[in-house]
Every structure is written in C-alpha cells, then in structure tokens.
C-alpha cells in the first residue's frame, strides 16, 4: 500500500474518494440510492491539494448538511490528529443521522399525503395535471405526529451531539495549550550582560 503521507498522491486520492459521492446513477438505481441514503457519502467536492485550510463543501443531497474537508498539516501532533479525527467522526455521524431522518421524513410525508388524498377521494394529480397537495392545517397534523413519534430519537441525538461537541471543545483547548506551550519553549532566553 502506498504511504499515506501528507501531500502524497495516495493520501489525496483517498481523501477525495472518501468525500466523493457514488457518481452518476441510472434511473432504475434511484430506489437503491434512496435506500442507501443513510450510508451516503458527501458530494464530489474536493478542495485544491495545495490548500492549507479547512474547506466547506456544497450541501449533501440527503442530509442537506455542508461537509467540512479538514486540512491535514504536515507537522500535525498526535493531539491535533485526535481532534481532527474526532471532528471527522462527528461530521460523519451527523451526516448519517440527518440522511436517515430526512429519508424517513420524506417517505412518511408522501404516505401521509397519499392516504389523506385517497380518503378525500382525490388522486395524486389535480385536473390540470399538477401534483395534488394538502393545506397547511392538514400538514400540521403530520408534522405534529412525526415530531411526537421521533421525540425520543431527537432527544438522544441532541444528548449525543452535546457530548461530542463538549469533547471537541475540550480537545480544542488542549491543542491550544499545547501550541502555546511549544511557542513558549521556542522563545530564546534572555541573558543578562
């Protein structure tokens, strides 16, 4: 296996591949694509290789979140590496949660609209050929039910989100102290003369 050194082509390809989508899909594969949305990767966006900053990509089509492409510095300390990895893990966890949640929401919303239209005796299309919709009051029932049904899931998500962010903040503080300490150690000592 090629060495994954910062700046190496192998690392760049690996990073770009890990942040790329599944590529062009045929129409018959759309159902599979929707099923696999929970495990989807982010867009094909890849920052320039000479970049020395984190980049924010375009929104993911399933989670609607913008992925962050983290810069890997050449002289990254073990603590900085752990912080970056923790941030990447949190981002992937967040992407997966919202991709699953949005897929579930859209599916249940379509089923709700379809069942309500059938109960009214309407079809999925109006006489003019446009897609039939429900009014805001009818949709409010769906939103209320969906939120009630997913309350526990959202509570667990929020709890985990806060835990992860506190851990990231803690590591950011440690990294800041480590950097400050290394700068203090590098300063030349003044001699009295």
From Swiss-Prot:
Location within or outside the cell: Mitochondrion inner membrane
Any one cellular-component term (Gene Ontology): matrix side of mitochondrial inner membrane
Annotated function: Required for cytochrome c complex (COX) IV assembly and function Protects COX assembly from oxidation-induced degradation, COX being the terminal component of the mitochondrial respiratory chain.
UniProt cross-references to PANTHER family, sorted A to Z: APOPTOGENIC PROTEIN 1, MITOCHONDRIAL, CYTOCHROME C OXIDASE ASSEMBLY FACTOR 8
Main subcellular localisation: mitochondrion
Descriptive protein name: Cytochrome c oxidase assembly factor 8
The organelle targeting sequence, given as a residue range: 1-26
Topology versus the membrane: Peripheral membrane protein
InterPro entries reported in the protein's UniProt record: COA8
Family per record: Belongs to the COA8 family.
Keyword entries, A-Z: Apoptosis, Membrane, Mitochondrion, Mitochondrion inner membrane, Transit peptide, Ubl conjugation
Gene Ontology biological process terms from the UniProt entry: intrinsic apoptotic signaling pathway; mitochondrial cytochrome c oxidase assembly; negative regulation of reactive oxygen species biosynthetic process; protein stabilization; response to reactive oxygen species
PTM info: N-terminal mitochondrial targeting sequence is cleaved from the mature protein once in the mitochondrion.
Entry's induction text: In conditions of increased oxidative stress, the protein is stabilized, increasing its mature intramitochondrial form and thereby protecting COX from oxidatively induced degradation.
């Amino acid at each position: 296996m090629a060495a994954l050194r910062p700046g190496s082509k192998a690392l760049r390809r690996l990073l770009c591949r890990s942040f790329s989508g599944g590529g062009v899909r045929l129409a018959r594969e759309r159902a599979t694509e929707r099923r696999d949305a929970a495990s989807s990767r982010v867009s094909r966006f890849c920052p320039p290789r000479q970049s020395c900053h984190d980049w924010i990509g375009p929104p993911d089509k399933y989670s609607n979140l913008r992925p962050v492409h983290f810069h890997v510095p050449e002289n990254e300390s073990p603590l900085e590496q752990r912080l970056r990895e923790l941030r990447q893990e949190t981002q992937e966890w967040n992407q997966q949660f919202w991709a699953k949640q949005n897929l579930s929401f859209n599916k249940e919303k379509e089923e709700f609209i379809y069942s309500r239209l059938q109960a009214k005796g309407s079809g999925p299309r109006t006489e003019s050929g446009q897609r039939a919709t429900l009014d805001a009051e009818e949709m409010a029932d769906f939103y209320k039910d969906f939120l009630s049904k997913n309350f526990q899931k959202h509570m667990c998500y929020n709890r985990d989100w806060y835990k992860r962010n506190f851990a990231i903040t803690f590591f950011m503080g440690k990294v800041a102290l480590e950097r400050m300490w290394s700068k203090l150690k590098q300063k030349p000592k003044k001699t009295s003369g």
